[in-house]
Amino acid sequence: MMQKRKEYLRKLMQKRDLDIILVFSDLNNYSYDTALNRVKPGLFHYYYITLREEGFLEIDYLVEELKFQTSLKIIPFKEDIPEISLAKLTKGLNVGIIGNAPFWHLKDIQNSIYDLNKESRNILLIKDDFEIDKIKSSAKEINNILKRFDSSKFIRKTEKEIGNFLSQAIMKNSEGLAFPVCVTSMKDIKQTTASFPSKRKISEKDIIVIDAGVVKEGFYSDCTRMYFLNYKEAEDNYIKLVNAHKRVISKIKPGLYLKEIVKLYKEELKKENLPEETLEIEDLGHSIGFYVHEHPMFYSSEQENIKLEENMIITLEPEIRFSEYRLRTEDMILVKEKSEVLTS
């Protein structure tokens, strides 16, 4: 799969009449590093690819560390002046750039520079068996943490205390948080189901939404669960939402258009007598794995021709509104003829 992704980049190079593509990675986002070479930057670096060769530009004091991860050629540079090595490597060449490279890194490149982020993102869509196994492990980790969470123990505790508790649990068996843990409770759930924890204390009658994910061996997960304290009406509606959600998942398969997922949710919500007209269709899901939020983020009209493909991994996170609260659940799904829920 990694070679297929590199061939895609080489074809893109020819299509755009480019001589070299630079792929920037840092510790905030190294999805392309993982997808193309299964390496992780020590701080930041560039992978480069031409029609005939490939390699890395790496900070001089991190070269030996990178050698443990790859046999490709490594060009060292000084951490504070990467622009000199980049200008030398690309002299006389038309350059494509992928990733969020700082402008000052590229300022000395003399020829044209083309942003390829939109055109390259498709190489992250399909995962191979190795990647699927790693993403499954990441998904299992966050699912188990949220399963073990006992909301009754946090009455009169703050959202921040819940967030800290979960963050510590995540850090025990993973590289870190996929994103800051979101904890939202009763007062704010009328407006949102994903917000940073506040000093608000959990009451005897309350609703708690937790949105969290882990990074494990470089692969990301994302999951949302709700917990109810003496609020039977909301809990009953949540059970109905989860039932509708499960039926939609059972219909997820390769070839399904993203726009059809919206239709499926509205049909299943209606069967449960839930307010299908309040479904938040613009925040219904996204691809995931190499990073927490990958293309496509759905659904919007510009994506109406996008189909699911086998071995995509997506989240589905239906959210609906009531007068006093919102409800949301979120799971990760491996797209197959019989799709698999990874967070269950």
Ranges and model annotations:
Residues M1-S344:
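Active-site neighborhoods and metal-handling regions in enzymes and metal-associated proteins
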